[in-house]
């Protein structure tokens, strides 16, 4: 036989592909079986020589799949080799992954526990072994395609006929042990500790074969290969002796399992040897896992599902969404707790193949981008969570605060927002705008609750520092530069630090913080508050290099030469927009941004005379309020918009009015007047309208209606624009319309692949909470970018939430009767000073305010999609989701050799159900 013929013969012996076994398909050089066997031979030729590669192929042809042989038995089948050479050849073939060895006696034919070699099945078996070889799969990348295809082709069109328990095919989900109810009649095989104790002393670990495979194929989902695959029993010893893994202790294995749960990875055990043996425990990520694909792609949960199903308690659930984000099956989504006018929403259950014809039209080919990525049911969920750009678990932390769980509330907030104290002072409060309670009386004082929670942490002896939660267990050593130390840049650094990086923030100013310290007055947010939250970032390993302007002091190219592999540009909009009218160059005219910078730096402590502020947004309010504190004269704001059109947060506008700022609506500056080079007044004209019929900014003026306002100072706060200097010099990154940096809307990647952008220079002028959201997305993209083979989009949670229909709900009477919204007290000693005069809520106010929450949202589990992994239970801090043992038949484990004995009867019963269902439908 030729080599190709030998490979084809061996491939047919091992394969589970029905079309090959039935003779419909041949094993040709482009067939996956051929690719796998040939890569093993090529690896052997490199490590040993061509003769050894040829010889191990001949030896393999004398073996039968999954029939173990001792060295004596192999010698009888291969008399052409002397004993010493045969032993060397068996070591070589074992290292190649085609053959495995063990000492077990499960078949009763090895009472003395002699070493025996076995020709493995492809999956699970030799394909994974070839992948975890530290050299082989990278040397011969076609190995990855072999693994991927052999985990797919034998199952396509078959999985719908597989009974509960998996029929000895592939892998089987085993739940998080602490999630198994104590009162359930669980079996020992449903507990990971049972298997680890059974094999204690023979436990090892290897890199994940699936993660490595997807990396090589360029389809990684950000779950970078690390040591996640635990080998047990003789397989662990085999891996150690062939350099496929190394030994670990029982305790180390338990630590890996805990880290896997922290990451949201699913525990699975091998399911091809019956109830008395497994050889591996995998910790699987749905974006890359071939085993989970067997149930998720084909929509046939029997291939994976454990005996358990998750159930959510609607009374306890607060729609934090953490279970949804990590559900590998997409079984949990956020819905609503409030009834509609027609009654409670009845959430649908996914169709199953038990009584339905199942073809590709029933598959979910997009499962990697749906499971854990689609957050809400079509009817929506809590409006506060949906409206927040960072999608903080608002309903959740309000519940915790009301129960006095302040530290837990802070931890929950910090999963999505690194700056709760900052946001507690200056947030845009999108959540309060959306709050369902606002349709009854007033929205919850959500921001005040968050501020209180953050202050408890700031007062604590030991601040909460979020722990690293790396997808590889270890820190990453890739160097990442954050250009700009504002909220977007620091948020990116924060989430990268959690992922295991040590990013470096380059900030051109003397201290980090961006507009938080330079553009917002201290009576709105104390600089000590900003510093305290930045200090937490330092403790997380973020480095700040201040007084360094990238593009001037050092270039991106120079940083690349220093080893930086990715850049996050978040330089904001640093220059104020101009009026472009006569007199703008007079002394006394200043941009609001420059004015606030000088005030915050302590360089400007007094103004003389009356002040006119031009602008109608929040920044203009800040400027006007700051000016009031520096002058004995009057402060008047003039803006284009009518009062109801002003782009201000109502609270901010009201605070300005309370301070004494006079707001004059529908006026536009025409010219600034002066004498001797100094401002003496300003001429304004009537603004008739601000936007045209399409909503585009197109102000219309009546120049015949004018007023002249005497003043000594004109502060212009009409917006900001970008000033990039040379930060992007020498790169392909470019601006759109000369303003914002062009980027992908999902990944925030610029036209230069290693440059990502965020904050105002990406989105235009927005708020701190918006910047935080873009910082998180930047971190997600950068992590994927700097790790080879990871895509920027596969299994990316785009964090899209839909709010419930507030026009179709029935509000709970007992909640509506709760007290009125708590008012924010004012410290009279701080009024019109540079200190924040707002008094933080008391604990009593917190409890009262939390009681007003209507608890709109909840998680809803589809039991037909749930695979019973229990990961959801590890993410819930409210005791709201639990596993129940409702599918005991799913714990039936049988040897792979008996799979057709299980599939046949089940398939026959299923066919009867399909016929009955079809007949019933025809009668209708």
Could you describe each region identified by the protein language model?
Residues 94-108, 332-333, 881:
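A short, conserved structural fragment
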Residues 329-383, 398, 444-446, 450-479, ...:
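Flanking helices and flexible, charged tails adjoining ferredoxin-like Fe-S electron-transfer domains
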Residues 623, 761-786:
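A conserved FAD-binding loop/helix module that cradles the flavin
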């Amino acid at each position: 036989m030729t080599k190709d013929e030998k490979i084809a013969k061996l491939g047919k012996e091992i394969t589970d592909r029905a079309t090959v076994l039935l003779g419909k398909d041949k094993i040709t050089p482009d067939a996956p079986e051929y690719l796998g066997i040939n890569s093993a031979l090529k690896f052997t030729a490199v490590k040993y020589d061509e003769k050894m590669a040829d010889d191990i192929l001949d030896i393999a042809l004398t073996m039968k799949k999954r029939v173990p042989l001792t060295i004596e038995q192999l010698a009888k089948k291969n008399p052409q080799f002397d004993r010493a050479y045969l032993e060397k050849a068996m070591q070589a073939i074992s290292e190649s992954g085609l053959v495995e060895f063990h000492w077990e006696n499960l078949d009763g034919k090895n009472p003395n526990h002699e070493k025996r070699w076995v020709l493995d099945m492809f999956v699970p078996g030799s394909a994974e072994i070839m992948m975890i070889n530290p050299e082989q799969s990278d040397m011969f990348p076609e190995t990855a395609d072999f693994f991927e295809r052999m985990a797919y082709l034998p199952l396509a069109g078959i999985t719908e006929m597989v009974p509960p328990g998996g029929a000895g095919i592939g892998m089987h989900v085993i739940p998080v042990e602490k999630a198994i109810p104590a009162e359930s009649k669980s079996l020992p095989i449903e507990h990971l500790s049972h298997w680890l104790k059974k094999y204690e002393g023979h436990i090892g670990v290897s890199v994940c074969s699936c993660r490595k495979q997807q990396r090589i194929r360029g389809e990684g989902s950000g779950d970078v290969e690390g040591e996640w695959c635990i080998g047990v029993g003789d397989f662990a010893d085999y891996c150690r002796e062939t350099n496929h893994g190394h030994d670990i202790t029982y305790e180390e294995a338990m630590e890996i399992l805990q880290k896997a749960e922290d990451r949201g990875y699913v525990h699975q055990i091998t399911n091809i040897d019956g109830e008395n043996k497994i050889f591996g425990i995998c910790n699987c990520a749905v974006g890359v896992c071939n085993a989970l694909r067997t149930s998720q792609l084909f929509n046939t949960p029997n291939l994976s599902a454990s005996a358990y199903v998750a159930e959510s308690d609607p009374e306890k659930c607060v729609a934090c969404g953490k279970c949804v984000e990590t559900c590998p099956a997409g079984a949990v989504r956020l819905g609503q707790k409030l009834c509609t006018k027609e009654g409670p929403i009845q959430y649908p259950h996914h169709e199953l193949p038990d009584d339905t014809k199942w073809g590709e039209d029933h598959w979910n080919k997009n499962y990697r981008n749906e499971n854990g990525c689609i957050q809400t049911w079509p009817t929506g969920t809590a409006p506060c969570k949906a409206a927040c750009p960072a999608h903080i678990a608002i309903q959740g932390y309000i519940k915790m605060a009301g129960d006095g769980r302040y530290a837990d509330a802070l931890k929950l907030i910090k999963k999505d927002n690194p700056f709760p104290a900052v946001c507690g002072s200056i947030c845009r409060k999108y959540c309060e705008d959306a709050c369902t309670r606002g349709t009854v009386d007033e929205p919850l004082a959500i921001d005040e609750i968050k501020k209180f929670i953050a202050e408890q942490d700031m007062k604590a002896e030991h601040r909460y520092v979020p722990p690293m939660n790396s997808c590889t267990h270890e820190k990453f050593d890739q160097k990442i530069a954050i250009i700009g130390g504002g909220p977007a840049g620091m948020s990116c650094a924060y989430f990268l630090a959690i992922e295991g990086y040590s990013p470096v923030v380059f900030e051109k100013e003397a201290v980090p913080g961006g507009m938080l310290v330079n553009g917002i007055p201290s009576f709105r947010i104390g600089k000590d508050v900003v510093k305290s939250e930045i200090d937490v970032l330092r403790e997380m390993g973020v480095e700040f290099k201040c007084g360094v302007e990238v593009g001037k002091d050092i270039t991106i190219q120079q940083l690349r030469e220093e080893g930086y592999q990715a850049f996050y540009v978040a330089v904001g909009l640093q220059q104020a927009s101009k009026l472009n009218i006569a007199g703008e160059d007079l002394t006394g005219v200043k941009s609001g941004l420059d004015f606030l910078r000088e005030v915050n730096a302590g360089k400007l402590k007094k103004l003389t005379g009356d002040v006119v502020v031009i602008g109608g947004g929040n920044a203009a309010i800040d400027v006007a309020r700051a000016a009031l504190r520096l002058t004995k004269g009057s402060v008047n704001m003039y803006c284009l918009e009518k009062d109801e059109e002003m782009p201000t947060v109502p609270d901010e506008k009201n605070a300005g009015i309370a301070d004494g700022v006079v707001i004059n609506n529908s006026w536009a500056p025409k010219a600034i007047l002066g004498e001797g080079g100094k401002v003496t007044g300003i001429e304004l004209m009537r603004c008739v309208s601000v936007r045209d019929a399409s909503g585009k900014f197109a102000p219309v003026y009546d120049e015949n209606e004018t007023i002249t306002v005497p003043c000594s100072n004109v502060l212009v706060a009409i917006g900001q624009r970008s000033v990039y200097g040379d930060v992007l010099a020498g790169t392909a990154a470019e601006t759109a319309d000369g303003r914002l940096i062009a980027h992908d809307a999902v990944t925030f990647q610029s036209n230069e692949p290693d440059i990502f952008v965020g904050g105002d220079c990406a989105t235009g002028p927005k708020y701190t909470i918006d910047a935080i959201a873009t910082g998180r997305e930047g971190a997600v993209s950068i992590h994927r970018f700097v790790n080879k083979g990871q895509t920027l989009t596969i299994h990316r949670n785009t964090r899209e939430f839909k709010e419930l229909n507030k026009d179709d709900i029935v509000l709970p009477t007992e909640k509506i009767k709760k007290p009125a919204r708590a008012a924010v007290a004012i410290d009279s000693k701080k009024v019109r000073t540079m200190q924040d005069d707002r008094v933080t809520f008391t604990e009593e106010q917190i409890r009262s305010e939390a009681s007003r929450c209507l608890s709109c949202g909840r998680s809803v589990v589809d039991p037909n999609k749930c695979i019973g992994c229990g990961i959801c239970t590890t993410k819930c801090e409210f005791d709201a989701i639990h596993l129940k043992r409702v599918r005991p038949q799913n714990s039936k484990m049988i040897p792979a050799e008996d799979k057709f004995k299980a599939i046949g009867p089940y398939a026959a019963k299923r066919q009867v159900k399909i016929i009955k269902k079809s007949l019933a439908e025809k009668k209708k």
